Amino acid sequence: MEGKEDKQQQHKIEDAGILYVTEKEEFKHEKKPGKSIQHSKPCVGRGRVYYAKFINTNVRTCNEPVPYIDVKKEPENQGDWWPHGKGLENPFQPPYDTKSTQRSDFKKPTCPLVSPVKHSKLQKPSYGIVPLVSPDASAELQRNFKEHISFIHQYDARKTPNEPIRGKRHGVFVQTEIKPGSRPTVPERTEVLLNASGSCSSEQSKKTEKGNSAESKMISPGLCRQNSQELLETKTHLSETDIRVAANASLRRPEKREKTAKVFQIAVVNALLTRHDPLSPPIKSQDKSG
């Protein structure tokens, strides 16, 4: 124990000697005015540094020394930062309008409107951002054009004009002019059927009159009634193919119409004869039997 106390006293004496030496050196510097240390002047706008150290307990920087400086707290002069005087009394305010800058283009200008040279003088000049459509377009002009969607068929990309015309691409609305002679003039279906049935019935009536006059003695009156009723039924129940033939015949030339009408009549007569052949042999009249 005595040894430890002696060591502590020696350390205190050494520390006191170091402090005594440092105090003497400071007095020497003060006595020599030529070798006085020149301290740096503090910067304008900054406080004077009165405390500085290194922070060694920062885990974020792996305990590397980080300098820390603290400045004396003095009233800051904020007059250099921005002026505290009064602002402008009458600031300029630009005109404010809810309309856009291009909205005035839709109004009719005061100056006279002039159309390009290539257009006719009768055409009214347009004004505005987008040219306006003239509402005076007649309905007859619209009827002469047929609007449809274009589709390209058998397109060959190996040709030299690879890209087709822009108006003929897929899905483009194209207007084709309808020529006056190309419009089909199709008669109504009722007229075709009436003409076909009327011509057939007239010729059939002539043939039946001749046949009846020649075979009046061979056929009984009961069979004639049955044949007349069956003829009426067959006229009403004509097949669809015969109707189509008659409709197509009316659209062709007059010479072909006559030929098709004759063929149609012959076909109807043959069908009637095959359907209405008498199962029993013809009954002879009593005059010839006697």
UniProtKB/Swiss-Prot annotation:
Residues 213-246 are annotated as: Mn 2. Keywords: Cell projection. Residues 128-160 are annotated as: Mn 1. It is found in: Cell projection, Cilium. InterPro entries: CMIP6. Residues 76-112, 197-228 are annotated as: Disordered. GO terms for cellular component: cilium. Pfam families: CMIP6 (PF15667). PANTHER family: RIKEN CDNA 4930505A04 GENE (PTHR35087:SF1), SIMILAR TO HYPOTHETICAL PROTEIN FLJ40298 (PTHR35087). This is Ciliary microtubule inner protein 6. It comes from Bos taurus. The gene is CIMIP6.
